[in-house]
Amino acid sequence: MKFELGHCLLNERLMEAGKSAEWLAKELLFKPERFYDFMENKRVMPLKIAISIADSIGCDVRALYELIPSDIEVKGD
């Protein structure tokens, strides 16, 4: 099944973990602004960063975004 990415849920996952974007930035050696861009849907997280974030806050990588099933069929596969 194909999915489209909905809204970023990083802020919600951070709140559940009792952590802040500043904490995450220090943990992963990034500027906090990068995480704010993800949270405000200005940028999409690269998979490598999403995996690191999920590991740091103890959630599944798929929990970082709303996943919207796509109705589009891929032909020729």
Q: What is each stretch, according to the model?
A:
Residues 23, 34, 63:
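Residues in the helix-turn-helix
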Residues 29-44:
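Recognition helix of helix-turn-helix/homeodomain-like DNA-binding domains
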Residues 42-55:
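Short, basic-rich loop-to-helix N-cap that marks the start of a DNA-contacting helix
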Residues 1-19:
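A short, Lys/Arg-rich alpha-helix, primarily the initiator
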Residues 1-5, 36, 72:
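A detector for short, charged/polar N-terminal pre-domain segments
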Residues 55, 65-77:
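Short, charged recognition helix plus adjacent turn
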